[in-house]
Swiss-Prot record:
<keyword id="KW-0804">Transcription</keyword>
<comment type="subunit">
    <text>Homodimer.</text>
</comment>
<dbReference type="Pfam" id="PF02954">
    <property type="entry name" value="HTH_8"/>
</dbReference>
<dbReference type="GO" id="GO:0043565">
    <property type="term" value="F:sequence-specific DNA binding"/>
</dbReference>
<dbReference type="InterPro" id="IPR005412">
    <property type="entry name" value="Fis_DNA-bd"/>
</dbReference>
<dbReference type="InterPro" id="IPR009057">
    <property type="entry name" value="Homeodomain-like_sf"/>
</dbReference>
<dbReference type="GO" id="GO:0003700">
    <property type="term" value="F:DNA-binding transcription factor activity"/>
</dbReference>
<comment type="function">
    <text>Activates ribosomal RNA transcription. Plays a direct role in upstream activation of rRNA promoters.</text>
</comment>
<dbReference type="InterPro" id="IPR050207">
    <property type="entry name" value="Trans_regulatory_Fis"/>
</dbReference>
<dbReference type="InterPro" id="IPR002197">
    <property type="entry name" value="HTH_Fis"/>
</dbReference>
<feature type="DNA-binding region" description="H-T-H motif">
    <location>
        <begin position="74"/>
        <end position="93"/>
    </location>
</feature>
<protein>
    <recommendedName>
        <fullName>DNA-binding protein Fis</fullName>
    </recommendedName>
</protein>
<keyword id="KW-0238">DNA-binding</keyword>
<comment type="similarity">
    <text>Belongs to the transcriptional regulatory Fis family.</text>
</comment>
<keyword id="KW-0010">Activator</keyword>
<keyword id="KW-0805">Transcription regulation</keyword>
Length: 98
């Protein structure tokens, strides 16, 4: 589950361990760990378009959740994300979310 702390601009990821303890860590830590895992699996192979890969992994759920939060209101969603409405529409189309 993703949450944003009210008093900061840090997105956090909440996890529950086997003792039902909830811990939170910044989303960036989860991204960093995912990249470490990805690089470990490469075994020295070259990779291209890593930026696009990571961006797509974050951008699609971001768009999905913002559109749910705004109940499909693209104007509100674009304002919330700080992007132009036309840019939002282009991104929604890219991921088949239009």
């Amino acid at each position: 589950m993703f949450e944003q702390r009210v008093n900061s601009d840090v997105l956090t990821v909440s996890t529950v361990n086997s003792q039902d303890q909830v811990t939170q860590k910044p989303l960036r830590d989860s991204v960093k760990q995912a990249l470490k895992n990805y690089f470990a699996q490469l075994n020295g192979q070259d990779v291209s378009d890593l930026y696009e890969l990571v961006l797509a992994e974050v951008e699609q759920p971001l768009l999905d959740m913002v559109m749910q939060y705004t109940r499909g209101n693209q104007t509100r969603a674009a304002l919330m994300m700080g992007i132009n409405r036309g840019t939002l529409r282009k991104k929604l189309k890219k991921y088949g979310m239009n």
